[in-house]
Structures are given as structure tokens and as C-alpha cells.
From Swiss-Prot:
Homodimer. Belongs to the triosephosphate isomerase family. It comes from the Bacteria. Keywords: Cytoplasm, Gluconeogenesis, Glycolysis, Isomerase. Pathway: Carbohydrate biosynthesis; gluconeogenesis; Carbohydrate degradation; glycolysis; D-glyceraldehyde 3-phosphate from glycerone phosphate: step 1/1. The keyword Cytoplasm applies. This is Triosephosphate isomerase. The keyword Ubl conjugation does not apply. It is found in: Cytoplasm.
Length: 260
């Protein structure tokens, strides 16, 4: 089954709502229409940018999707500072990132919590981008494949085959995020293939062949084509390189070159 690559920008805590509009406009202007037939392009933005991005994308009928970077596990109630999946759905979000290593490290989020957040998003028709990845010491010990497979299993607990068919998984080796270090294409393929084999076990071959697995971790325009060209890598979760609309457009265009 041919999987359309997904190139998703994760802006993290960058760009206010005015900068967000300018960045998406630049991205849309810089990426010719024919590329949208080859790759899906998305941005996951700070909560405060969502309404502005929604208005721009819907008003100009842009072929770009968008989403948030986190979601509450709760539906509603006395949870100060939290944002529910229903709120995100009302803002037209297609995606929400859950389990990013920065959430796991700085906010103590467990894989069990990540799974509950993913289910909360799915219940509102939002596709979760579930992030997994190993720290440097695990990579150096040579146990990274087993580590990531078990982390993925725990982060998908309670999700049905139908849920998994609407889910995206992003493999982000923690040692490569924001460091300039990039896993080789072979490294990315090794882990992404193991993740796909896990999905076969959990949900069957048909779901596994349709599910998109992204690579994240210092993805650049110069490296994206080789990585996305791997048989089990279906796009990228792009951090810093997505903050400039024109640069992100170039990266997406380069990813499209591997699509037949």
C-alpha cells in the first residue's frame, strides 16, 4: 500500500499568532501546488496560534492541515490550564502531538498517560501523532529497538485497530532532537520497521501497511529525502526547520522527490 508522506512541522513554543499567519502564508506561497499531490503538509502550533491559523487556512482554502502539540486526557472540568480534545476539534484540528520527549522529560508524562491522551483525541476525530524514541544511553547500549518497541506498545495501550488506522507514530531518537545529530537513514529504517512489525501484531497487516511512521530529530532539507526514501519511513516531524515558511517548503518539496 502506497503511503503518502506526511511532513509535519512542530513549532514547539515559538511564533505568536501574527508570526504564525506570516509563516503559513510563506509556506503556502513557496510550495507549488503539484507538491501537495505527493506529500501531506501540516503544522502543529501553540494553542494561542490555532484560531489564527484556522482562519487563514480555511479562508484561503490552503492545502495545509494543522493541529496542536498536546491535549488533556480529561474531557472537561476543573483542570486549570488544560485544553480538551473537544476544544481542539472545534478549532478544526486534524492532528495533535502526544508523548513528545520534551513532554515526557519536562512534564513527567508516562507512556500510559500518552495512550489515554491519544484515545481522547481519537474520540473527537483528531489523529494523534504519538512520539516515541530512545535516549542516548539506550542507543549506546544497543537495546534501542527493544526499548522503542515496548515504549510504543505502552503508548498505544487501549487503542483498537480502528484507532490505530487513524494514528501516526513519530520515531524521534531523543539524542537527535535539536542537537544537529541525525540518525542515519538505516538507523531510522531499523526502528521504524520494528514499529511497523509491532502494529502488525497489534492490529493486523492491513492497518500496519496503511499507518504512517515519521522520523523526527534534526530533520533538514538536505537529509529528508534519503530518510523518507526508506521503505518504512513515511515522512518527518520537523522542529526548528519548520519555523521559516520558505525553508519548510523546500524541505517538503525535497521529501516529495522520493514519491513516484
Amino acid at each position: 500500500m502506497a503511503r503518502t508522506p506526511l511532513i509535519a512541522g512542530n513549532w514547539k513554543m515559538n511564533l505568536d499568532h501574527l508570526q504564525a499567519v506570516a509563516t503559513v502564508q510563506k509556506l503556502a506561497f513557496a510550495l507549488p501546488k503539484e507538491y501537495y499531490e505527493k506529500v501531506d503538509v501540516a503544522v502543529t502550533v501553540p494553542f494561542t496560534d490555532l484560531r489564527s491559523v484556522q482562519t487563514l487556512i480555511e479562508g484561503d482554502k490552503l492545502a495545509i492541515t494543522y493541529g496542536a502539540q498536546d491535549v488533556s486526557q480529561h474531557e472537561a472540568g476543573a483542570y486549570t490550564g488544560e485544553i480538551s480534545a473537544q476544544m481542539l476539534a472545534k478549532l478544526g484540528c486534524t492532528w495533535v502531538v502526544v508523548g513528545h520527549s520534551e513532554r515526557r522529560e519536562y512534564h513527567g508524562e508516562s507512556s500510559e498517560l500518552v495512550a489515554v491522551k491519544a484515545k481522547a483525541a481519537l474520540n473527537q476525530g483528531i489523529s494523534p501523532i504519538v512520539c516515541v524514541g530512545e535516549p542516548l544511553e539506550i542507543r549506546e547500549a544497543g537495546t534501542h529497538v527493544e526499548y522503542v518497541v515496548e515504549q510504543t506498545r505502552a503508548s498505544l495501550a487501549g487503542l483498537t485497530a480502528d484507532d490505530l488506522a487513524k494514528t501516526v507514530i513519530a520515531y524521534e531518537p531523543v539524542w537527535a532532537i535539536g542537537t544537529g545529530k541525525v540518525a542515519s537513514a538505516a538507523d531510522a529504517q531499523e526502528v521504524c520497521a520494528a514499529i511497523r512489525n509491532l502494529i502488525i501484531e497489534l492490529a493486523g497487516k492491513e492497518v500496519a501497511e496503511g499507518l504512517r511512521i515519521l522520523y523526527g530529530g534534526s530533520v533538514k532539507a538536505e537529509t529528508v529525502a534519503e530518510i523518507v526514501g526508506q521503505p518504512d519511513v513515511d515522512g518527518g516531524l520537523v522542529g526548528g526547520a519548520s519555523l521559516d515558511g520558505e525553508a519548510f517548503a523546500k524541505l517538503a518539496a525535497n521529501a516529495a522527490t522520493v514519491v513516484d
